[in-house]
């Protein structure tokens, strides 16, 4: 048993030294390590919770507004709505049967629900971004300003998401014009997704961050979201279709929650990559038994994480992390 432990530790040490010397491996491992330090899974779950409750009210508002804007074009309305539902491949096929109907009452209720859940989602996203970037609580907006700001950001992001949905809808509606039309609309929609992520990474952080430092993560998030949509379509066709016959609405709810949760995970991982790259928080120490000395990146990352807990202007949190065995 002792010999096996020694061999295991030796392998771990060799792997740790290898990833420190090779950035192509050390960087993604450092992103994953910091994501775990920041409890990214819990942050994603919180954002997904509010996002889940905002989806259906927003869809009600969307269908109602379409009814007012295009009163004499029911076929065009249906095509745009179906395209919007296509943004959620896990549930879109379940909702395209005409279960969403718009009315004045639906608009009022949908707006109320969307505002409540949407503000909660924005606040949760702001908290996540500030935690990733290590913004202390004492430097964040106060209770009232945070909610007013969240309301304004909700309209900005909602408008951008609506524009992306309309562009996707134009690709479906104009499919008879040829493949060029569809490719152009999808490309524009993807470009708008990139812009939306880029904007979100900047304005959701209560700290001055260079736009150029956020570009790489925004690109990764945009392509990751597109890949998630493709995988969602595959999942619907091979797994959820048969599960829906057995579990009905329960499968629909689980599918939607899973899709939102994974989408938020992708977004936060992309944002975390921006933080690690900008502050050069790699390589990290990855010895399983934590016997390897901490690196400078370990000290910087753990210090940033600890400073987040400063909640008063006269409070200072000091972090001590020995590096290379020295105090």
Where are these regions (language model features)?
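Membrane-embedded alpha-helices and immediately adjacent juxtamembrane helical segments
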Residues: 1-327
């Amino acid at each position: 048993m002792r010999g096996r432990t020694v061999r295991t530790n030796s392998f771990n040490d060799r792997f740790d030294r290898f990833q420190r010397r090779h950035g192509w491996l050390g960087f993604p491992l450092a992103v994953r390590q910091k994501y775990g330090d920041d409890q990214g899974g819990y942050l994603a779950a919180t954002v997904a919770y509010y996002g889940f409750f905002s989806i259906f009210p927003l869809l009600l508002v969307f269908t109602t507004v379409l009814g007012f804007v295009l009163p004499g074009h029911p076929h065009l309305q249906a095509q745009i709505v179906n395209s919007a539902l296509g943004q959620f491949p896990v549930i879109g096929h379940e909702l395209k049967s005409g279960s969403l109907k718009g009315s004045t009452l639906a608009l009022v209720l949908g707006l109320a629900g969307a505002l409540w859940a949407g503000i909660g989602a924005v606040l949760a996203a702001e908290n996540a971004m500030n935690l990733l970037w290590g913004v202390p609580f004492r430097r964040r907006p106060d209770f009232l300003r945070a909610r007013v700001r969240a309301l304004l950001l909700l309209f900005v992001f909602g408008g951008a998401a609506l524009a992306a949905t309309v562009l996707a809808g134009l690709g479906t509606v104009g499919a008879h014009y040829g493949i060029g039309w569809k490719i152009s609309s999808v490309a524009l929609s993807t470009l708008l997704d990139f812009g939306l992520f880029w904007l979100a990474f900047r304005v959701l952080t209560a700290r001055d961050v260079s736009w150029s430092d956020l570009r790489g993560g925004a690109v990764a998030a945009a392509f990751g979201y597109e890949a998630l949509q493709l995988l969602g379509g595959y999942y619907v066709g091979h797994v959820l279709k048969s599960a829906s016959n057995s579990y009905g609405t329960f499968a629909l709810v689980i599918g939607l929650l899973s899709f939102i949760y994974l989408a938020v995970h992708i977004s936060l991982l992309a944002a975390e990559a921006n933080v690690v790259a900008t502050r050069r928080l790699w390589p990290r120490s990855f010895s399983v038994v934590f016997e390897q000395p901490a690196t400078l990146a370990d000290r910087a990352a753990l210090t940033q994480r600890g400073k987040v807990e400063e909640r008063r202007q006269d409070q200072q949190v000091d972090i001590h992390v020995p590096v290379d065995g020295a105090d």
